[in-house]
């Protein structure tokens, strides 16, 4: 069976207090993050972090995209200014300073290598 050339995915997650992988680029595909937004549904300002992790030769390198970005109550923040390319096995990680109030949504295009 032939592999799909392009696959669109939506990722949703309530941000935990410790970084968690919310998307890993599949083998044979490149992921293109088209949208990454976080909404604060709580009653006070909360902070969110989003990072890219690439492991090469067994060494994981974390690059922060946003770190401790404050989002006011009942507001939303775009976490990317443009697109982000994720190579095979790259991981997108998310965390916040609360485990209940930051809701993430992302749109990702996986394209066959």
Regions of interest found by a model, annotated:
Residues 1-31, 35, 56, 95-113:
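C-terminal interaction-tip segments
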Residues 5-7, 52, 71, 81, ...:
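Generic detector of low-complexity/intrinsically disordered segments
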Residues 38-43, 97:
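Short solvent-exposed strand-capping/beta-turn motif centered on an Asx-Ser/Thr pair
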Residues 41-44, 55-57:
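Acidic glycine-/aspartate-rich tracts in secreted/extracellular proteins
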Residues 48-50:
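Short beta-strand elements bearing conserved aromatic residues within extracellular beta-rich modules
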Residues 56-91:
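Intrinsically disordered, low-complexity Pro/Gly/Ser/Thr-rich segments with frequent PxxP/GP/PP motifs
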């Amino acid at each position: 069976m032939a592999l799909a050339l392009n696959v669109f995915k939506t990722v949703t997650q309530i941000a935990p207090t410790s970084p968690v992988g919310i998307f890993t680029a599949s083998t044979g595909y490149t992921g293109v993050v088209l949208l990454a937004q976080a909404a604060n549904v709580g009653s006070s300002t909360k902070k969110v972090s989003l990072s890219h992790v690439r492991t090469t030769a067994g060494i994981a390198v974390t690059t922060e995209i946003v770190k401790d970005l404050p989002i006011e109550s009942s507001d939303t923040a775009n976490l990317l200014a443009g697109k982000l390319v994720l190579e095979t096995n790259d991981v997108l990680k998310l965390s916040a300073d609360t485990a209940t109030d930051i809701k993430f949504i992302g749109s990702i295009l996986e394209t066959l290598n």
